[in-house]
């Protein structure tokens, strides 16, 4: 394979990698917004739950029953983590990191957008 074909292959790989990472961005943004909203709801519900004087006087489950906003948002947050939201909000970074690991064997790397970074060849003497 000559150097022109190799350059074309590298450009095609870079185009596909940047396209894939770029396509992940909208979904990642939506997952991040969902995580932020549910986290804020859980924090707000927890604050209201903690400052309620009735919380100390009743049992734990009765207290949760009296604060459905906190209970539902907490269950939702736990469900989101079981569904893997912690991986979905950083999916492009995971893809880029895995590509860097593989590309390191070929003296290459990539940035977070998928652009290839060619490193100089080590001189063997």
From Swiss-Prot:
Membrane topology, as annotated: Multi-pass membrane protein
Membrane-spanning segments: 33-53, 65-85
GO cellular component, one term: nuclear envelope
Signal peptide: none
GO BP of this protein: lipid metabolic process; positive regulation of triglyceride biosynthetic process; protein localization to nucleus
Pfam short name (any one): Tmemb_18A
GO MF annotations, alphabetized: protein phosphatase regulator activity
InterPro entries (UniProt xref): NEP1-R1
Expression sites by tissue: Muscle specific with lower expression in other metabolic tissues.
Modified residues (N-acetylmethionine): 1
Similarity comment: Belongs to the CNEP1R1 family.
Subunit organization: Interacts with CTDNEP1; the complex dephosphorylates LPIN1 and LPIN2.
Function comment: Forms with the serine/threonine protein phosphatase CTDNEP1 an active complex which dephosphorylates and may activate LPIN1 and LPIN2. LPIN1 and LPIN2 are phosphatidate phosphatases that catalyze the conversion of phosphatidic acid to diacylglycerol and control the metabolism of fatty acids at different levels. May indirectly modulate the lipid composition of nuclear and/or endoplasmic reticulum membranes and be required for proper nuclear membrane morphology and/or dynamics. May also indirectly regulate the production of lipid droplets and triacylglycerol.
UniProt name for this protein: Nuclear envelope phosphatase-regulatory subunit 1
Source species of the chain: Homo sapiens (Human)
């Amino acid at each position: 394979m000559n150097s022109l074909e190799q350059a074309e292959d590298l450009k095609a790989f870079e185009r596909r990698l940047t396209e894939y990472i770029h396509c992940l961005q909208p979904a990642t943004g939506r997952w991040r917004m969902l995580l932020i909203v549910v986290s804020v709801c859980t924090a707000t519900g927890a604050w209201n739950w903690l400052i309620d004087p009735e919380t100390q006087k009743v049992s734990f489950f009765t207290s949760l029953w009296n604060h459905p906003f906190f209970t539902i948002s907490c269950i939702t947050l736990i469900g989101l983590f079981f569904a893997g939201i912690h991986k979905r909000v950083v999916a492009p970074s995971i893809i880029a990191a895995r590509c860097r690991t593989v590309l390191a064997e070929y003296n290459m790397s990539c940035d977070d957008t998928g652009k290839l970074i060619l490193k100089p060849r080590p001189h063997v003497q």
